[in-house]
């Protein structure tokens, strides 16, 4: 690894034993791919696949009017450009969207009434604006009305066919009732069930059930067709009153002989009466040449005819197909001399009489009767005719407009029924229904396994694209109705396509989906991990999904098919447990919506490099080995027997039988869980809490990556999109806190590409959860960067790695009861050094509207407000940046006109003297709410178009334009530099053909040689008209200048387009004149009551901040930072934290050694130490070859501790941790002697102490602390409102009242229950008394007592209060 690339990439000591087979895929790829497939934005119209928008338009169009005289046809759709950038949309409260335009064709036909044919009279084609559609940002989110939202993918039951049974609960006999259901995406559901009497019933859309054969007859099958399909036939011969059956191995196998059968020639007994026809018997019969097996006549009586039986002489029907042969019919057969008949083979085991029984029950004979019967059952009130009924059935299952199985449904149907219809066929076929019934009967006969609806082969993911597609379709169908009505109401000849199409219903549906759908959620933006996991979340709730109340235990449970697809750990605690889950690290969603996971292919016990992505239903019976199964150098398994999974069960199998192998140990868990080191040593419940709490961690002001990591940190930081990443290779030419300019290398593939990129960094932006989003550059000027390199860290990242918390020294010991019940004792140093300090940003908004009484005004001239309150406002009435504000301070001054009131003569006089102001306006300024104090860091002003801008607005705009100008100038400077270098390479040494002047001075005369030094003296533009003696070189030079002009013009155009937005003003909501947003930043220092946690679910609340001198300390005087309770470990079974603390201790002591060697400049020892630590990661020769400067730079990275990487399920072993502790000179037990800071005495026991990664969670005491003296009251009960948001009071329940009574605090209690609560008159009297200085309580009757008496009166009880004096 070159020294240059080591600069920004942290090297960690690796403990993983397994090679990386496949990279972790893009973590938010699912969102981007799904929406990309929906829009197909960059695809030319003619090459678009029939998915997403294209599919919807093609399915709804063409729209024909009711008379079929005109048709509106869809040609193509296209998108316009983006009007505002993402940042502008967030600031202005707009939606980040692009306009959609569709090209449609209106075709008008001439109808020939005599022949009934039509000919085209007129075609009009037009492109129409079709509303706007939100666009996904690069990070997989949407900006809707200025807020960043995520559309969560839904996990729902796939369409297709499902087989199930009732486990014998429905019928009293305990017989199991088997059923199946065909579920389409759109259209009617069909249920098929076999009742305990073996009759096949069907129901359509859960209506009344009917015999299944009625539907078969309605579809055009005759009784003979049905019987032929479901049964095999047997031929029966009648010879001289003896009855024989045709010899057939299949039908005889397993049956009993009803008569003795002998060898026709030798007379030997082949099978005795009552014995079973087994393999040997059948073989003997075959060799004996028996082709007719004798049976008893009574075996034929009761059999079912397979074909109609008639008297050949008279044509009289004796019995029809499907009838049972009675004794009378059998006698007639003998009388008429019928020698051969066909019966159905029914043995009661493999072949039952279900269909025959159903046919006898169905009572319809013809197709017409069957159609009318079904129509009447589904539409009971409507008059039925065969034509209407036929049309109805066709629409029900066979017309794509009304019935859609979807490609997934057809795939599942084919897979389950063994059919082979093309996936593009999305309606049912007649054969599918027959196959479904046949499969169901077979399932019942064999008592086979039914489908598990919780198996991931039967559940699929609907991502953003599909969810929006369904909504868009609803909108289009609404629009289709309106278009049809318009076409029939007006004369179509005079209309253009735009007169027919109104895109409002479609836009409304899209807006509703993004704004109010349960699956479109406000993004959890606490930290990069919470963003990433929110985008990878799968929810079983939402429209068309489950509800919390109805979801049972089975749906929520972990299923074997979740392996590698859904994380078994990460899910919320509470009512949503198991319904909201997370995608596993390597999982991806395929085109059909099924979750796939990668496996390595094993061929002849050799593990190949080939990777296969498999959905759950294809995994089936493949034996799959674990990722950590030992493999030799030749790629074969070391052990002859390997642990493998077969159909979800673990077993030991032969290495030669293994077909697939996991790619990585952490493919089982999600991203959050794979960030927990030693996860394998934690109990699942605590791991669940650990992965959930990492998402609540607040980004700190100073970040540091964990010393003990898992290697996934850099992947999350890269894919979350919070860090700034280089897109192309190049060199950093400029860096400051707000921007990075990178000059790119010449791209041979695209020589016209822009040679420079300016990366603008976000500074102190407020996130959705009020945390601070800030970029910090980590590159230096002159540094080389490759694509994918991190240029600037975002929130909670450090050197391109996720850094949610801090590495702190933790001791496990009790300390004065301050760590009782998971409390955490914290050292003062953490607070003093701002280790856990975080910055939070609040946004306050004020709007000046045009009211009925006049315009509101934002101004610094506010009536009845003292001068000291306005000291921080500027002349526009907006608070200055940098002002320290506290609750009640004015942020933006605003006055609102009051209604005119009758003035007294005195007021009139005052008004005349002091002017109009003051009296007719009221102060409605924006003030700082209680509980917020901080520094004003930004203010944004938006003015409506046509309204004059104030000074502050102009200042803000000038500042923004200055930044844009700087970007433009930097870009042009790099373009000029690149041009100069190209010209230098091209022209140096050439002879000049035209003179070159600088002002009036001639620098180059004709015929002079061009030198390299010349290019530094003369501006590049001077060379534009230069010609040299070589024509080809002159031509190349002109081409370079052409490129230069194109690039510079493009830069300038982009700049002009950007600043053109500043002139006119903003598009604000109706009635709004001006909108001001003020941002206040607050520093939150770690304080008592804050919630903290480790990564193993070990959470607690800070109980006390202890002075440094009282903390336990090491022999060298170093104090610990934090004291945790050792009793929190054994019962919780999260031992991972102990291993983490030991490895953290090793990391820290090794860092101390490196630090000491650096200070003492012992470079030889340092190289030895680094080689010993990084024995696998960096070749010893490379460390040996480092220069002193390079060595110091590299080693100083590890002064505070050597960073370790211990992957999940493949981490550091105990022996390795011990070896590292020994290497660092610490005790192998990981324990140390600590001294009590209060007494200076060593503690009796050795104490487990080391470095743990601790997080500060988003439950901060400053946000929860709240106090009230007076405030709002409820209207009915007149009691104070509840909660911090309502500025409410604290409720006292009956138990609190009992407690006060028990203490005998009668007066305090009376005050609580009256004046402090809902005694209105008493409140007023109390106020008056306090003003007069008489602190005497004078309570009255509480309002809630009056509410009670009113309720009693409503019940007819007359309740009156008898006052004391009335009594007397």
Curated annotation (Swiss-Prot):
The keyword Hydrolase does not apply. Keywords: DNA-directed RNA polymerase, Nucleotidyltransferase, Transcription, Transferase. CDD domains: RNA_pol_B_RPB2. GO terms for biological process: DNA-templated transcription. GO terms for cellular component: DNA-directed RNA polymerase complex. Its EC number is 2.7.7.6. It comes from the Bacteria. Coiled coil: none annotated. Gene3D superfamilies: 2.40.50.100, 2.40.50.150, 3.90.1100.10, DNA-directed RNA polymerase, beta subunit, external 1 domain, DNA-directed RNA polymerase, subunit 2, domain 6, RNA polymerase alpha subunit dimerisation domain, RNA polymerase Rpb2, domain 2. GO terms for molecular function: DNA binding; DNA-directed RNA polymerase activity; ribonucleoside binding. InterPro entries: DNA-dir_RNA_pol_bsu_ext_1_sf (IPR042107), DNA-dir_RNA_pol_bsu_external_1 (IPR019462), DNA-dir_RNA_pol_su2 (IPR015712), DNA-dir_RNAP_su2_dom (IPR007120), DNA-dir_RNAP_su2_hyb_sf (IPR037033), RNA_pol_bsu_bac (IPR010243), RNA_pol_bsu_CS (IPR007121), RNA_pol_bsu_protrusion (IPR007644). It catalyses: RNA(n) + a ribonucleoside 5'-triphosphate = RNA(n+1) + diphosphate. DNA-dependent RNA polymerase catalyzes the transcription of DNA into RNA using the four ribonucleoside triphosphates as substrates. HAMAP family: RNApol_bact_RpoB (MF_01321). The RNAP catalytic core consists of 2 alpha, 1 beta, 1 beta' and 1 omega subunit. When a sigma factor is associated with the core the holoenzyme is formed, which can initiate transcription. Belongs to the RNA polymerase beta chain family. This is DNA-directed RNA polymerase subunit beta. It comes from Desulfosudis oleivorans (strain DSM 6200 / JCM 39069 / Hxd3). The lineage of its organism: Bacteria, Pseudomonadati, Thermodesulfobacteriota, Desulfobacteria, Desulfobacterales. The gene is rpoB.
């Amino acid at each position: 690894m070159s020294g240059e690339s080591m600069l920004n990439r942290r090297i960690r000591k690796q403990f993983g034993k397994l090679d990386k087979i496949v990279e972790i895929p893009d973590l938010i790829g699912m969102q981007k791919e799904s929406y990309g497939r929906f829009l197909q934005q960059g695809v030319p119209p003619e090459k678009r696949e029939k998915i997403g928008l294209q599919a919807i338009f093609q399915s709804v169009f063409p729209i024909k009017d009711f008379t079929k005289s005109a048709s509106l046809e869809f040609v193509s759709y296209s998108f316009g450009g983006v009007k505002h950038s993402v940042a502008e949309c967030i600031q202005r409260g707009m939606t980040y969207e692009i306009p959609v335009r569709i090209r449609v064709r209106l075709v008008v036909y001439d109808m020939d009434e005599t022949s009934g044919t039509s000919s085209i009279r007129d075609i009009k084609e037009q492109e129409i604006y079709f509303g706007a559609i939100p666009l996904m940002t690069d990070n997989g989110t949407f900006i809707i009305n200025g807020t960043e939202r995520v559309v969560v993918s839904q996990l729902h039951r796939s369409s297709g066919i499902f087989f199930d049974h009732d486990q014998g609960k429905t019928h009293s006999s305990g017989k199991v009732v088997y059923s199946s259901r065909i579920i389409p995406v759109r259209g009617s559901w069909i249920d098929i069930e076999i009742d305990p009497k073996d009759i096949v019933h069907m129901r359509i859309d859960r209506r009344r059930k009917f015999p299944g054969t009625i539907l078969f007859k309605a579809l055009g099958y005759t009784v003979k067709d049905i019987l032929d399909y479901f049964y095999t036939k047997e031929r029966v011969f009648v010879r001289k009153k003896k009855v024989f059956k045709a010899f057939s191995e299949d039908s005889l196998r397993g049956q009993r002989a009803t008569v003795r059968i002998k060898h026709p020639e030798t007379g030997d007994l082949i099978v005795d009466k009552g014995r079973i026809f087994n393999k040997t018997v059948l073989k003997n019969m075959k060799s004996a040449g028996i082709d007719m097996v004798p049976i008893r006549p009574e075996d034929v009586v009761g059999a079912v005819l397979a074909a109609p039986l008639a008297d050949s002489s008279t044509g009289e029907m004796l019995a029809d197909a499907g009838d049972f042969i009675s004794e009378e019919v059998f006698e007639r057969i003998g009388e008429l001399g019928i020698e051969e008949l066909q019966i159905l083979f029914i043995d009661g085991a493999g072949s039952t009489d279900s269909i025959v029984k159903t046919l006898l029950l169905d009572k319809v004979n013809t197709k017409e009767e069957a159609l009318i019967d079904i129509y009447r059952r589904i539409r009971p009130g409507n008059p039925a005719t065969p034509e209407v009924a036929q049309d109805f059935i066709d629409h029900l299952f066979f017309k794509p407009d009304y019935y859609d199985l979807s490609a997934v449904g057809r795939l599942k149907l084919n897979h389950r029924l063994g059919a082979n219809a093309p996936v593009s066929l999305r309606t049912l076929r007649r054969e599918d229904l027959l196959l479904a019934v046949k499969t169901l009967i077979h399932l019942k006969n064999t008592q086979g396994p039914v489908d598990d609806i919780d198996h991931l082969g039967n559940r699929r993911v609907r991502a953003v694209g599909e969810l929006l597609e369904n909504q868009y379709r609803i909108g289009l169908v609404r629009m289709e109705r309106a278009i049809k009505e318009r076409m029939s109401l007006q004369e179509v000849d005079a209309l253009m396509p735009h007169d027919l199409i109104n895109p409002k219903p479609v836009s409304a549906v899209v807006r509703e989906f993004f704004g109010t759908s349960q699956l479109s959620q406000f993004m959890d933006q606490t930290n990069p991990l919470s963003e990433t996991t929110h985008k990878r979340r799968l929810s079983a709730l939402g429209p068309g999904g489950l509800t919390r109340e109805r979801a049972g235990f089975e749906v929520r449970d972990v299923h074997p098919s979740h392996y590698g697809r859904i994380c078994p750990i990460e899910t919320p605690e509470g009512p949503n447990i198991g319904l909201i889950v997370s995608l596993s690290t390597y999982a991806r969603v395929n085109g059909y919506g099924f979750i796939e996971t990668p496996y390595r292919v094993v061929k002849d016990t050799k593990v190949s490099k080939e990777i296969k992505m498999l959905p759950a239903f294809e995994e089936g019976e493949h034996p799959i080995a674990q990722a950590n199964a030992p493999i030799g150098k030749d790629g074969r398994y070391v052990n002859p027997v390997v642990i493998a999974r077969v159909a979800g069960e673990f077993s030991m199998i032969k290495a030669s039988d293994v077909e697939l192998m996991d790619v990585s140990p952490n493919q089982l868990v999600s991203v959050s869980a794979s960030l927990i080191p030693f996860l394998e040593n934690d109990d699942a419940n605590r791991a669940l809490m650990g992965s959930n709490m990492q998402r609540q961690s607040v980004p700190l002001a100073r970040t540091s990556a964990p010393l003990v990591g898992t290697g996934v940190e850099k992947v999350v930081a890269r894919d979350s999109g919070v860090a700034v990443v280089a897109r192309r290779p190049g060199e950093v030419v400029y860096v400051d806190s707000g921007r990075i300019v990178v000059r790119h290398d010449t791209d041979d593939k695209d020589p016209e590409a822009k040679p420079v990129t300016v990366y603008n960094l976000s500074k102190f932006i407020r996130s959705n959860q009020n945390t601070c989003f800030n970029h910090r550059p980590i590159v230096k000027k002159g540094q080389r960067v490759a694509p994918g390199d991190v240029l600037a860290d975002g929130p909670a990242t450090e050197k391109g790695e996720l850094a949610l918390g801090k590495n702190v020294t933790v001791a496990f010991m009790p300390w004065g009861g301050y760590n009782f019940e998971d409390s955490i004792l914290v050292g003062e140093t953490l607070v003093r050094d701002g280790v856990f300090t975080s910055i939070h940003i609040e946004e306050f908004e004020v709007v000046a509207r045009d009211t009925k009484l006049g315009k509101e005004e934002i101004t610094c001239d506010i009536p009845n407000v003292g001068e000291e309150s306005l000291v921080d406002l500027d002349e526009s009435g907006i608070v200055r940046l940098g002002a320290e504000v506290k609750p009640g301070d004015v942020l933006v001054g605003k006055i609102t006109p009051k209604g005119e009131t009758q003035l007294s003569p005195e007021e009139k006089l005052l008004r005349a003297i002091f002017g109009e102001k003051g009296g007719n306006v009221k102060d409605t300024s924006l003030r700082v709410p209680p509980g917020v104090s901080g520094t004003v860091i930004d203010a944004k002003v938006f003015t409506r178009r046509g309204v004059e801008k104030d000074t502050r607005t102009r200042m803000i705009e000038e500042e923004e334009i200055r930044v844009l100008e700087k970007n433009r100038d930097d870009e042009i400077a790099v373009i000029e530099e690149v041009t100069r270098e190209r010209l230098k390479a091209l022209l140096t040494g050439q002879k000049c053909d035209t003179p070159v002047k600088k002002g009036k001075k001639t620098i180059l005369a004709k015929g002079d040689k061009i030198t390299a030094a010349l290019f530094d003296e003369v501006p590049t533009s001077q060379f534009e008209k230069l010609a040299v003696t070589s024509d080809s070189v002159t031509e190349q030079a002109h081409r370079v200048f052409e490129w230069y002009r194109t690039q510079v013009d493009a830069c300038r155009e982009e700049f002009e387009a950007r600043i053109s937005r500043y002139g006119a003003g903003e598009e604000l909501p109706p009635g709004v004149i001006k909108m001001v947003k003020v941002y206040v930043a607050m520093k939150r220092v770690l304080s008592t009551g804050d919630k903290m946690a480790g990564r193993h679910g070990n959470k607690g609340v800070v109980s006390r901040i202890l002075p440094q001198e009282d903390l336990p300390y090491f022999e060298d005087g170093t104090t610990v930072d934090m004291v945790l309770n050792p009793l929190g470990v054994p019962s919780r079974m999260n031992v991972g934290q102990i291993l983490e603390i030991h490895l953290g201790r090793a990391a820290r002591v090794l860092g101390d050694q490196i630090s000491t060697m650096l200070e003492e400049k012992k470079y030889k020892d340092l190289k030895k130490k680094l080689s010993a630590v990084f024995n696998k990661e960096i070749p010893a020769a490379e460390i040996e070859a480092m220069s002193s400067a390079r060595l110091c730079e590299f080693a100083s990275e590890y002064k505070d501790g050597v960073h370790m990487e211990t992957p999940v399920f493949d981490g550091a072993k105990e022996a390795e941790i011990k070896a590292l502790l020994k290497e660092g000179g610490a005790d192998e037990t990981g324990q140390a002697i600590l001294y009590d800071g209060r007494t200076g005495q060593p503690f009796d026991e050795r104490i487990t102490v080391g470095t743990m990664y601790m997080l500060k969670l988003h439950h901060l005491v400053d946000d929860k602390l709240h106090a009230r003296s007076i405030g709002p009251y409820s209207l009915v009960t007149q009691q104070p409102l509840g909660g911090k948001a309502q500025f409410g009071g604290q409720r006292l329940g009956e138990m609190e009242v009992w407690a006060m009574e028990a203490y005998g605090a009668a007066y305090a209690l009376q005050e609580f229950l009256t004046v402090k609560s809902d005694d209105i008159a008493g409140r007023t009297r109390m106020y008056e008394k306090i003003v007069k200085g008489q602190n005497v309580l004078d309570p009255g009757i509480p309002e809630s007592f009056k509410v009670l008496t009113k309720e009693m009166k409503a019940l007819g009880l007359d309740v009156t209060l008898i006052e004391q004096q009335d009594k007397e």
